[in-house]
Amino acid sequence: MSKKQTKDKANGAKATKTIALNKRARHEYHLEERYEAGLALQGWEVKAIRAGRANIVDGYAYVRSGEIYLIGAQITPLIQASTHTVPVERRDRKLLLHRAEIDKVLSRVEREGYTLVPTALYWSSNKVKLEIALAKGKQNHDKRDAAKDRDWQRDKQRVMRRHNRDA
């Protein structure tokens, strides 16, 4: 182990490495509160995630019998995956959250019409974590407004750079 890695671990810094991002979620939804959840995975899934074969773009989470499950996320099995189990790419995966967090999320989803959307999948100290966000769907005019604001910010930066360069 190198000196830098030893120093980082000695200082208590948690190393996080992003596995998959859901960039479409920011475009399709207004994201509000974010939660970090663990995932109940099988062995072949962890191995496939280490190989970078995870996709959370089509995924969403829902509450069933007081527990939260991730639906639609795809973990493609490796060819040399376990022979004694049949890997299912898009199976329901249980999310591990504290009871208070589950209750809070459940109330917002049921009463206020929020959706649970996965935004990032990453390693946190040798454990796979999923960041989920409470989200409300954007309508087309909201998406157009966001694009217009983004273009305006870009143009403004361009004008400021040009002005500062000439001055």
Curated annotation (Swiss-Prot):
Gene Ontology biological process terms from the UniProt entry: trans-translation
Region called Disordered, residue ranges: 139-167
Compositionally biased tracts (Basic and acidic residues): 139-158
InterPro entries recorded: SmpB, SsrA-bd_prot, SsrA-bd_prot_CS
GO cellular component, as recorded: cytosol
Any one GO molecular function term: RNA binding
Signal peptide coordinates: none
Disulphide bond pairs: none
Subcellular location(s) of the protein: Cytoplasm
Protein task: Required for rescue of stalled ribosomes mediated by trans-translation. Binds to transfer-messenger RNA (tmRNA), required for stable association of tmRNA with ribosomes. tmRNA and SmpB together mimic tRNA shape, replacing the anticodon stem-loop with SmpB. tmRNA is encoded by the ssrA gene; the 2 termini fold to resemble tRNA(Ala) and it encodes a 'tag peptide', a short internal open reading frame. During trans-translation Ala-aminoacylated tmRNA acts like a tRNA, entering the A-site of stalled ribosomes, displacing the stalled mRNA.
PANTHER family: SSRA-BINDING PROTEIN, TMRNA-BINDING COMPONENT OF TRANS-TRANSLATION TAGGING COMPLEX
Protein name, entry field: SsrA-binding protein
Gene this protein is translated from: smpB
